[in-house]
Amino acid sequence: MIIRQMTKEDATEVAQIEKECFSQPWSTQGFTDALDHSAFFLVAEEAKQILGYVGMYVTVPEGEITNVAVKPEYRDRKIGSALVEQMQKWSLEHGVNRIVLEVRSGNMPAICLYEHKGFVKLGVRKNFYQFPKEDADIMEWNG
């Protein structure tokens, strides 16, 4: 498996993973628009197939992780962990020393991953998510 920077050519495949993983997924156009602006994405790839991705909007010295997803059949292979770790490394190399994110309060696998990578809970956004309605934990990492 390799982790590399996402390109616009990856947007359709990434959007398909997004659709499999989220109730309100970004579209292919949403990903290409993000890449045109201040977003940076990494993809995990094996045998020319994208297995997962992580995205972040960057305003140095801060970043906000927008999405982390791994194809359901490839979970439990530490792909999400590797993606977040590479994003943290990239961040430090590019002057980003603080990353924030929101995660569904009931998404314990993701919360555990973030905590393992050094993120701490800052607070809660009530009813942040829709379909289904759920609170979001706000988490932060300081590099």
Regions found by a protein language model. Give the residues of each.
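Acetyl-CoA-dependent GNAT
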Residues: 2-73, 84-86, 90, 94, ...
